[in-house]
Amino acid sequence: MCIRDRYDIYHSYEGVNNIKVINDHAGISPVEVSEDILDLLEFSLKEYELTKGGVHVGMGSVLSIWHDYREMALGESKFPMVPSMDELESAAKHMNIQDIHLDRQAGTVFLADPEMRLDVGAVAKGYTAQRLADTLREAGVTNALLSLGGNVVTIGARGDGKPWRVGIQNPDLGAENPYIQVVDLTDMCLVTSGTYQRFYEVDGKRYHHIINPELLMPWNEYQSVTILSPDSGEADALSTAVFNMKLEDGLSLIESLDKTEALWILPDGSQIESSGFRAYTEEGR
């Protein structure tokens, strides 16, 4: 059974207690899970604290509503709609992070609120990429580039000793240049969150998949946020959290973290960089 199946919130698999099984047993009983699920959830709770709730794996009740509306809009629906605030606020009553109980000794996870749902989409891909990179390093791999759906992890430098060159997606998908910047990475990771991924429109307004935990709506202050970090899991979590923060708050958080940089693309296409970001670009060398 692959790691992705363990983190699945939509499907059950025989003999595997995944995130869906945890959700199905919310308010009923603890679920015995594999160590990697406990590790992921423990990491997620740490990132919740670090980002002051900017990334929240316990808001599945809200995210599932947006998922359903988005799927309808991207499917055969001729009249795409936006969920009402009443519907969202009702679901938001069931996203208290304190209702997630991890028991390391028993190897279990329990959601105390029967209506709470986990959704690890904001952290699972980056966390999995980091674990894969760690496994490769332990096996003796010294030069590699991994790309898991936009989560890029570099192990060492290229075989010729030069850094890996990685393009940052231009959020304007119709632009002549597909990359808005190119960075040089050695033992670093890159993750981008953007409004150009998984969105639909209603009355000319874009509704993307990054839902702000406070507003319960997509946050449209940026077109994209890119994070550079030595750890792919943290980069993934930060890309969502910083996307959901005011610029000054996100910049303050990034500047407080070691070896971590960020690039914000604003709605008008202008760019804002953290203080050390330029060192990874051609202009900074």
Feature locations, PLM:
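Mature catalytic core of soluble alpha/beta enzymes
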Residues: 4-285
